[in-house]
From Swiss-Prot:
Positions in coiled-coil regions: none
Source organism of this protein record: Aspergillus niger
Cysteine disulfide partners in this protein: C508-C525, C519-C535
Gene responsible for this protein: cbhB
Superkingdom to which the source organism belongs: Eukaryota
Taxonomic lineage: Eukaryota, Fungi, Dikarya, Ascomycota, Pezizomycotina
Subcellular location: Secreted
UniProt name for this protein: 1,4-beta-D-glucan cellobiohydrolase B
């Protein structure tokens, strides 16, 4: 993805504290908001999990361990406390969060709402949260051979904003077991990393990032340090009401690593060093609008962003198992009871509607993009990180590096919009300036709800209903619906299915498969490999 810089304007006592971090403060008790989500099985039954979310350490007050004196104010460190990276980590503490009042974060049952601007005793901009398995560990998702489904409402996200849901290869405990300088851990949202190898993090690997710190020239709250935090990133969803993309970003290592200076590459390094790091900062992306399908996604279009909808992402392996090699990433939607196939590319040289190795190579060639995706392992490398387990990130942000034009406008701005790959959405090239977006759209927000995870074909047919009611028990189950309306971008067919027919895009065959082997009306059971056939 492009730069992930979720910025905020001055928190009363401190701003944008650590992201892999030091000691624990005692001024505010940390209480994680609850969030239910479901795991599903191949027969369509789903079990509700009583989870919780934690805000990233970058949003927290960080202060001296011996007082309420800020370690970091504005976009500068207090050099009397933070004389070097190691000393700073020992001298500074993260404190608890007040989620709704300070950050505009609320939950209700399975629904998480993130407000863009929250005006409390100070002004907060955006947020980044992680799903937890317990009070001290992040939930790890192993995506291979599975599908991940959620409902989203982007109707209140204008040009320049990004409601992003994605996975990164963070440590489950936030780094406490590996780095003795990190006492806060996942409970306080530490350990962040992504494919941009972000250098705006205040703490990495249990040490501060104050050495070589340079305050930002266009943001009063941020800066760049000598170190960055790198790891593989699977952007399942980056979107506003105008455009969306899903993108795979592999890295050379399946685990988080620390990098130095401009050799980190990515958004935070000098332009000539963008591709000098160990990760792919561009990734292999699928944006229907960028691929010429300009009538698929947006207000009043096939996927109508005026209303909530369900996003389904499938991670297909060569043998249909969770231990196979990643070969394809598929997308479909459910809205108003209709299953909607992903908007296909309109370019003859870039075929299909999913991410495959062939798609990535042909897209890079057509758009003239440097193919660093293959350099860092391609889909197979992305799959290796998935096999290890990845942490779910839920966020809302604006973009001080590129005004989000890479998502929803013409980018680069000095290229003709008629050049393949330049047009990414209908937003003006003058849009997305953070100061303008924050002033004109302070009430923007995104909601994520009804998160489900399970074998391919197990989640979405029961996940299209709206609502966020809380389950009474972590062991309660819901049963997959047995009828739906089916829709592609060119053809619509309706009819009831039964337990003897697989749903649209569901599994319908393969070695060891015991479910239905026929498809609902309008769909054909299509052979993918010896272990997997799908209704297409």
């Amino acid at each position: 993805m492009s730069s992930f810089q979720i910025y905020r304007a001055a928190l009363l006592l401190s701003i944008l504290a650590t992201a892999n971090a030091q000691q624990v403060g005692t001024y505010t008790t940390e209480t994680h908001p609850s969030l239910t989500w479901q795991t599903c099985t191949s027969d369509g039954s789903c079990t509700t999990n009583d989870g919780e979310v934690v805000i990233d350490a970058n949003w927290r007050w960080v202060h001296s361990t011996s007082s309420a004196t800020n370690c970091y104010t504005g976009n500068e460190w207090d050099t009397s406390i933070c004389t070097d990276d190691v000393t700073c980590a020992a001298n500074c503490a993260l404190d608890g969060a007040t989620y709704e009042a300070t950050y505009g974060v609320t939950t209700s049952g399975s629904e998480l709402r993130l407000n863009f601007v929250t005006q409390g005793s100070s002004k907060n901009i955006g947020s980044r949260l992680y799903l937890m398995s317990d009070d001290s560990n992040y939930e790890l998702f192993k995506l291979l051979g599975q599908e991940f489904t959620f409902d989203v409402d982007v109707s209140n996200l204008p040009c320049g904003l990004n409601g992003a849901l994605y996975f990164v290869a963070m440590d489950a405990d936030g780094g406490t077991s590996e780095y003795s300088g990190n006492k806060a851990g996942a409970k306080y949202g530490t350990g962040y990393c992504d494919s941009q190898c972000p250098r705006d993090l205040k703490f990495i690997n249990g040490e501060a990032n104050c050495d070589g710190w340079e305050p930002s020239s266009n943001n009063v709250n941020t800066g760049v340090g000598d170190h960055g935090s790198c790891c593989a990133e699977m952007d399942v969803w980056e979107a506003n009401s105008i455009s969306n993309a899903f993108t795979a970003h592999p890295c050379d290592s399946v685990s988080q690593t620390m990098c130095d200076g401009d050799s980190c590459g990515g958004t935070y390094s000098a332009s000539g060093d963008r591709y000098s790091g160990t990760c792919d900062p561009d990734g292999c992306d699928y944006n229907p609008y960028r691929l010429g399908n300009t009538d698929f996604y947006g207000p009043g279009l096939t996927v109508d962003t005026n209303s909530p909808f369900t996003v389904v992402t499938q991670f297909i392996t060569d043998d249909g198992t969770s231990s196979g090699t990643l070969t394809e990433i598929k997308r479909l939607y459910v809205q108003n009871g209709e299953v909607i196939a992903n908007g296909a590319s309109t370019y003859s040289s870039v075929n299909g509607s999913s991410i495959t190795s062939a798609f990535c190579e042909s897209e890079k060639t057509l758009f003239g993009d440097e193919n660093v995706f293959d350099k860092h392992g391609g889909l197979e490398g992305m799959g290796e990180a998935m096999a290890k387990g990845m942490v779910l990130v839920l966020s809302l942000w604006d973009d001080y590096a590129a005004d989000m034009l890479w998502l929803d406008s013409d980018y680069p701005v000095n290229s003709s919009a008629s050049t393949p790959g330049v047009a990414r959405g209908t937003c003006s090239t003058d849009s997305g300036v953070p100061a303008t977006v924050e002033a004109e759209s302070p009430n923007a927000y995104v909601t994520y709800s009804n998160i489900k995870f399970g074998p391919i074909g197990s989640t979405y047919s029961s996940g299209s209903s709206s609502g966020s009611g809380s389950s009474s028990s972590s062991s309660s189950t819901t049963t997959k619906a047995t009828s739906t309306t089916l829709k592609t971008t060119s053809t619509t067919s309706s009819g009831s299915s039964s337990t003897s027919a697989a749903q649209a895009y569901g599994q319908c065959g393969g070695q060891g498969w015991t479910g239905p082997t026929t498809c609902v009306s309008g769909y054909t059971c299509t052979y993918e490999n010896a272990y997997y056939s799908q209704c297409l």
